[in-house]
Amino acid sequence: KLPFSRTTMPPVLPYLTEGSRIFLSSWKNRVLPKKYEGNATQICNQIINDCWNGRYFQTSTTNFTQFWTRDFGWCTKSLLTLKYEKEVHQTLRYALNHFKEHHKISTTITPGGKPFDFPTYAVDSLPWLIHSIKVSKFPYYSFRDFLNKEIKKFYSTVINQHTGLVKPEIHFSSIKDFAVRKSSCYDNCMVALLAKDLKGMKLDNPFETFSYPELIKRHFWNGEYFYDDLGHQKYVAGDANLFPFA
């Protein structure tokens, strides 16, 4: 059984173009690696500045020059603490303009401005984007209609409307790109984050009838640790035991 159906398979072209670009970039950096001078703080500041390309914060300085929704969501609060509010807002405007133009929110935007999902539609793309918008106080009014359409699409695509949980029968892209899991704890934590962030925002919130802290504890907590997914296999997964506390 394929981890995702033919109907949800993303286009092949972005894989080919991005794969070739990353391969060439990786080869170049092995031959001519860039070295930074200074102490740890100075080096980190230089890397952050190199990740700002004038249009958006790219994920890394070399191989991953794309915009990644998840990675940016992880970094948004820290970037704000480091006084990069202007660049954060410009990155969000860049991403939202391209998402709106292509009628979808995705995991990734190529350096050429084309959104695509790797490897398929991800549960955490919309939650991390909304989180970045909220914590940065980005003025999203002009994108409200588009965001509400994406929230509605997310709810119908991802959520079992009887349980409130991520549909276990569908494989979605996630923090572990190719891992096949059944409604993972991490994915449901992302839905919980989305439900929480939508409160107080002038956006639709179809999740407000569910109590996600209670659902996650009931379905994943075994008294000692959180299960990785609804399969309840007896191993401890790092993401499953980090994000419930985030």
Task: Please provide the spans of the model-predicted regions.
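Solvent-exposed loop and edge beta-strand segments that line ligand/cofactor-binding
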Residues: L2-F23, Y56-G73, L80, T110-P127, ...
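Long hydrophobic alpha-helices with heptad-repeat/coiled-coil character
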Residues: N39-I43, I47, C51-T62, P139-E169
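Low-complexity, Ser/Thr/Pro/Gly-enriched N-terminal "stalk/linker" regions
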Residues: L2-F67, H89-Q90, Y94, H103-K104, ...
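Well-ordered alpha-helical scaffold segments within catalytic/enzyme domains
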Residues: E18-L32, G73-E85, P127-S142, C189-D204, ...
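Generic beta-strand structural signal
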Residues: W52, F99, I159, F220-W221
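Catalytic cores of carbohydrate-active enzymes
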Residues: H102-T108, H162-S173, V180-A246
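Aromatic-rich carbohydrate-recognition surfaces in CAZymes
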Residues: T65-H162, N188
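Generic alpha-helical secondary structure signal
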Residues: K34, G38, Q42, K86, ...
